[in-house]
């Protein structure tokens, strides 16, 4: 499941974000419209897929919306575009060395991402609360646990904050 498989690239040529009809109405987004998704780690653009498969949650008297996005796409291959993994922090699961983080807080903005110098201003405007954005993958977010070289599996679940 990647953009390197030509038949899959032909069937799904662009990244999509599946959302509930309620969220689409709230944000004035139509099925197939371009949207921008922004998190504390970055921003990507995708096409909106409005679907009843995704439903809002009712938590503690509040409505919480969710979206679903495939994470098997990258920025290389015959079909290029945004990668969902650009939105999440780097957190490799040590046993199988794949990303363990598959949930995040984000904002959805109708329209395409701005290019050039306007991108940074746009990002700072729409980044979720808790910012500022941390666009350097090698730099952990402020307050995040940080493992140092020489630690690893031998710590048995303890975080090395030397």
PLM regions: where:
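Long, contiguous, secondary-structure-rich segments that constitute the structural scaffold
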Residues: 2-162
């Amino acid at each position: 499941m990647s953009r390197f498989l030509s038949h899959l690239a032909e069937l799904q040529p662009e990244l999509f974000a599946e959302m509930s009809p309620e969220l689409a109405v709230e944000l004035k987004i139509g099925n197939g419209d371009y949207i921008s998704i922004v998190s504390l780690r970055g921003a990507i653009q995708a096409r909106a897929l409005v679907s009843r498969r995704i439903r809002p949650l009712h938590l503690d008297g509040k409505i919480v919306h969710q979206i679903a996005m495939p994470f098997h796409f990258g920025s290389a291959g015959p079909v290029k575009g945004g990668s969902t993994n650009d939105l999440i922090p780097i957190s490799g699961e040590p046993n199988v060395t794949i990303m363990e983080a598959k949930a995040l807080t984000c904002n959805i903005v109708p329209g395409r991402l701005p290019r050039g110098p306007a991108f940074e201003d746009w990002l700072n405007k729409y980044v979720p609360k808790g910012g500022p954005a941390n666009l350097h993958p090698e730099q952990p977010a402020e307050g995040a646990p940080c493992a140092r070289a020489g630690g690893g599996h031998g710590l048995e679940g303890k975080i090395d904050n030397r």
